[in-house]
Swiss-Prot record:
Annotated membrane topology: Peripheral membrane protein
Protein's recorded name: Elongation factor 4
Catalytic activity annotation: GTP + H2O = GDP + phosphate + H(+)
Residue ranges of domain tr-type G in the record: 5-187
Entry function: Required for accurate and efficient protein synthesis under certain stress conditions. May act as a fidelity factor of the translation reaction, by catalyzing a one-codon backward translocation of tRNAs on improperly translocated ribosomes. Back-translocation proceeds from a post-translocation (POST) complex to a pre-translocation (PRE) complex, thus giving elongation factor G a second chance to translocate the tRNAs correctly. Binds to ribosomes in a GTP-dependent manner.
Subcellular location: Cell inner membrane
GO molecular function, one term: GTPase activity
PROSITE patterns in alphabetical order: G_TR_2
Length: 599
């Protein structure tokens, strides 16, 4: 099938839980990618974590052959993408490899913020967007209302949107038929020099680096010598092929196709995502526009529980960064926790997932410090610095102005829950920018401090709106704000890993809450442990974990008061001596207590 008119490349985009992966399952079933024995629900979500949480984290690609009603057999290359706001970069990467996108909308819930955001990304990249109404078998499906929403919120024509139910398989054939006609075929020259874009890479212990590529021009086959444009290194191709979802080797990959290339690259940084591959004998092929690097929004320190694991931890991070290009890290040391890494994540879910993947796939025990965002600091000498770690904050005397990141958040919420959502946004120091009333929902746009959004805003939003509100946010700008560093002292010593940067108005309240929380979590010692919260030199809250003590008077029956006093004084002196030399072990829960503090 060398003719490009038979190829269709498309992504499936949708909000969380609108049925992307189930629709992908139906496609695979109908086009015979797997036997019935191998078929399972969400067959593409191959990571244990994805299956447990029921979410897609990585974009997965599949090549299927579909015999359409016009008698032709089409090659469908499709990519199932994540729906969660933290993984938007996975979506934009997938879209770069496609000519079209299926916008899957739950006919009961209607359009949600994440589908809007992903849809705009697709339209910006010039893709043909085809709306599909899913879950039509549910009694609460309202196709007419949802079509209206698609037109009013996203602005694409939805009059003839295909209705289907991925679960029962109803209407899925119509989706495939419409797909073949609505989505354009790829453009490219098979005879031109090779030009291929790396969409994703991962590390296999046996094969080295496996890269998923979209071939724009030319062809690549086993034995070819390929050149990686950014590094200038040449590798020999060991095998090429496609996922049907099974790993299937083919003779070659041609223009317009999506598949994998294995070239025995051992160096983890040998094939960066977004890079261009070409053949060794045509080194002057121009570089394809890659993807814009995503900036991490949340930073946290990750430390191995035992310092012997440090090297393994570094290797694990390197391998994970290859697979997840938005993860950034740099070494850091903490007085309390020893050596570790400061890692940058796209959001809280991303951070949880990375920590779980490190603990599971690489068998590490980790301690995480409280996440913070990046602050912009203007110093008295006019220099601007960016701080992602509260303990690195310069002395307050040298700071002229502190600016915090503000993000533009778009929230879609049913009218009944609007009041609660607005109250929540005000509590989080939000400023309302816009409000549109749509058929059943309201779209509100707020400017919110990133610090408030990344920690627990999403969970609070879901609970205050009974799960109906949806959120999409993106970094907008830095804005001057009255911020202070809140330090936690344990027995008079600062614990650098527990420091926080908070708004001055919330600081005393936050300090009190944090201290109370820590009191519950730090186990009782043989001596009193004082927990204090301080801003600069001023202590704003304190509580004490009382000492455990033995009843030294148990052996005195009656007896002289001076005898009792002697024993008590002796105990007191011992406790005092202990307090001078004793150290307090802080459990992992205490570091995470910082997250649970309501502002």
């Amino acid at each position: 099938m060398s003719d490009l008119s038979h190829i269709r490349n498309f992504s499936i985009i949708a909000h969380i839980d609108h049925g992307k992966s189930t629709l992908a399952d139906r496609f695979i079933q109908m086009c015979g990618g797997l036997s019935d024995r191998e078929m399972e629900a969400q067959v593409l979500d191959s990571m244990d974590l994805e299956r447990e949480r029921g979410i897609t984290i990585k974009a997965h690609s599949v090549t299927l052959h579909y015999k359409a009603q016009d008698g032709k057999t089409y090659q469908l290359n499709f990519i199932d993408t994540p729906g969660h706001v933290d993984f938007t970069y996975e979506v934009s990467r997938s879209l770069a490899a496609c000519e079209g996108a299926l916008l899957v909308v739950d006919a009961g819930q209607g359009v949600e913020a994440q589908s809007v955001a992903n849809c705009y990304t697709a339209i910006e990249q010039g893709l043909e967007v085809m709306p599909v109404l899913n879950k039509m078998d549910l009694p609460q499906a309202e196709p007419e209302r949802v079509k209206e929403e698609i037109e009013s919120i996203i602005g694409i024509d939805a009059t003839d949107a295909v209705a289907c139910s991925a679960k029962s398989g109803m209407g899925v054939l119509e989706v495939l038929e419409r797909l073949v006609t609505a989505i354009p075929a790829p453009e490219g020259e098979i005879e031109a020099p090779l030009q291929a874009l790396i969409i994703d890479s991962w590390f296999d212990n046996y094969l080295g680096v496996v890269s998923l590529v979209r071939v724009k021009n030319g062809r690549v086959k086993k034995g070819d010598k390929i050149l990686v444009k950014s590094t200038g290194k040449v590798h020999q191709v060991d095998s090429v092929g496609v996922f049907t979802p099974k790993h299937t080797e083919t003779v070659d990959l041609k223009a317009g196709e999506v598949g994998f290339i294995i070239a025995g690259i051992k160096d983890i940084h040998g094939a960066p995502v977004g890079d261009t591959l070409t053949l060794n004998n045509t080194p002057d092929v121009e570089v394809l526009p890659g993807f814009k690097r995503v900036k991490p929004q949340v930073y946290a320190g990750l430390f191995p529980v035992s310092s012997d694991d440090f090297e393994d931890f570094r290797d694990a991070l390197q391998k994970l960064t290859l697979n997840d290009s938005s993860l950034q890290y740099e070494p850091e040391s903490s007085e309390a926790l020893g050596f570790g890494f400061r890692c940058g994540f796209l959001g809280m879910l991303h951070m949880e997932i990375i920590q779980e993947r490190l603990e599971r796939e690489y068998d590490l025990d980790l301690i995480t410090t409280a996440p913070t965002v990046v602050f912009e600091i203007v110093q008295k000498n006019g220099e601007i610095i960016y701080v992602d770690n509260p303990s690195k904050l310069p002395d307050l005397a040298s700071i002229q102005e502190m600016r915090e990141p503000i993000c533009r958040a778009t929230i879609l919420v049913p009218k009944d829950h609007l009041g609660n959502v607005i109250t929540l946004c005000i509590e989080k120091r939000g400023v309302q920018r816009d409000m549109h009333f749509l058929s059943g929902q309201v779209q509100v746009v707020y400017d919110l401090p990133m610090n408030e959004v990344v920690l627990d805003f999403f969970d609070r939003l879901k609970s205050t709106s009974r799960g109906y509100a949806s959120l999409d946010y993106s970094f907008d700008r830095f804005e001057p704000s009255n911020l202070v560093r809140l330090d936690v002292l344990i027995n008079g010593e600062k614990v650098d890993a527990l420091a926080l940067i908070v708004h001055r108005d919330n600081a005393p309240y936050k300090g009190r809450q944090l201290v109370e929380k820590m009191k519950e979590l730090i186990p009782r010692q043989m001596f009193d442990v004082a927990i204090q919260a301080a801003i600069g030199g001023q202590i704003i809250a304190r509580s004490t974990v009382k000492a455990l003590r033995k009843n030294v008077l148990a052996k005195c029956y009656g007896g002289d008061v001076s005898r009792k006093r002697k024993l008590l004084e002796k105990q007191k002196a011992g406790k005092k001596r202990m307090k001078q030399v004793g150290s307090v072990e802080i459990p992992q829960e205490a570091f995470l207590a910082v997250l649970k503090v309501d502002s």
